[in-house]
């Protein structure tokens, strides 16, 4: 059978009708296009029918929404009062308060945390992928040079690290691995290894499900509509933390620095002390 451009467009259109996201279809396009290009080079076909067919097929990406302050407070209170999920509270507070990527969070070691000066040094991240030794964690540099940064701790984050140290001692969650020459990881499983990113998103999903189950039952008893928590991921916590900074009038350049997204042109704290002051004020919250 000769593959034609119309066949590919029909295929993508069918996937779109099935509700697949544009990003998913784009991924398929990225697999098909070079494969057919190779067939052209080998003389199997004369023309690549896939090239230029991506278009805007598929559902657009949903805009990621941050939790409101009320939702954030309710969620953290629920976790704090839960015997099942309370051990996850410090990690969530760090991600909310420091606006860290999940890879940066699980890659934190105790040597990265300066409790005296209340700063977090972010200089790398842990990524999980298949290498020569199979699937395992790899120490990686941050996505950009901007990812290397020192983040002032809020009071919530400072207390979270203190609590996590207590939990590690109480439950024996000590890091027993060395990855890329780094050791002493803060957030670990019961086996002494860093928590996987999928594991973080898994317990966040379970927390929201448990919260909504409790809220639905309470709303039924009080004869009102339940105020359910939306689905969240590790990125939601980071995005929410950034939103809180904006609500506290932190300078956009300082926000970019904290998020690890600032552009070249000098350290933002060196040119805008008001931004640093706002971060310091935010510490007490």
Predicted feature residues:
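C-terminal secondary-structure termini that scaffold catalytic or DNA-interacting sites
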Residues: 117, 128-148, 155-157, 218-224, ...
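Short, charged hinge/linker segments at domain and secondary-structure junctions
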Residues: 37-62, 220, 225
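Long, amphipathic, Lys/Arg-enriched alpha-helical "connector/arm" segment
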Residues: 6, 17, 59-87, 97-100, ...
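DNA breakage-rejoining catalytic core of tyrosine-based enzymes
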Residues: 1, 45-47, 58-77, 123, ...
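Short, basic (Lys/Arg/His-rich) helix/loop patches that form interaction surfaces
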Residues: 18, 22, 77-88, 98, ...
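Short, charged phosphate-coordinating catalytic segments
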Residues: 37-48, 95-126, 253-254
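N-terminal core-binding DNA-recognition domain of tyrosine site-specific recombinases/integrases
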Residues: 1-44, 61, 83-84, 194-199, ...
């Amino acid at each position: 059978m000769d593959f034609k451009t119309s066949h590919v467009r029909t295929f993508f259109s069918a996937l779109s009708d099935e509700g697949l996201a544009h990003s998913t279809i784009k991924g398929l396009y990225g697999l098909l296009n070079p494969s057919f290009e190779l067939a052209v080079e080998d003389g199997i076909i004369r023309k690549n029918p896939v090239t230029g067919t991506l278009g805007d097929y598929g559902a657009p990406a949903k805009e990621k929404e941050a939790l409101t302050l009320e939702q954030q407070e309710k969620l953290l209170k629920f976790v704090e009062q839960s015997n099942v999920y309370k051990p996850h509270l410090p990690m969530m507070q760090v991600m909310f308060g420091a606006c860290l990527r999940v890879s940066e969070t699980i890659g934190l070691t105790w040597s990265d945390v300066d409790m005296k000066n209340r700063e977090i040094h972010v200089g790398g991240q842990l990524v999980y992928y298949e290498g020569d030794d199979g699937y395992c964690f790899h120490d990686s540099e941050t996505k950009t040079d901007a990812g290397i940064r020192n983040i002032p701790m809020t009071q919530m984050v400072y207390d979270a690290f203190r609590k996590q140290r207590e939990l590690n001692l109480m439950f024996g969650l000590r890091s027993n691995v060395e990855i890329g020459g780094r050791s002493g990881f803060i957030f670990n499983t019961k086996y002494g290894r860093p928590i996987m990113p999928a594991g973080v998103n898994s317990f966040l999903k379970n927390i929201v499900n448990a919260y909504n189950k409790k809220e639905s039952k309470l709303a039924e008893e009080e004869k009102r509509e339940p105020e359910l928590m939306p689905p969240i991921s590790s990125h939601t916590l980071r995005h929410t933390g950034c939103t809180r900074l904006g609500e506290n009038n932190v300078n956009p350049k300082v926000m970019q620095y904290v998020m690890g997204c600032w552009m070249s042109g000098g350290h933002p704290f060196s040119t805008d002390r008001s931004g640093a002051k706002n971060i310091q004020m935010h510490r007490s919250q």
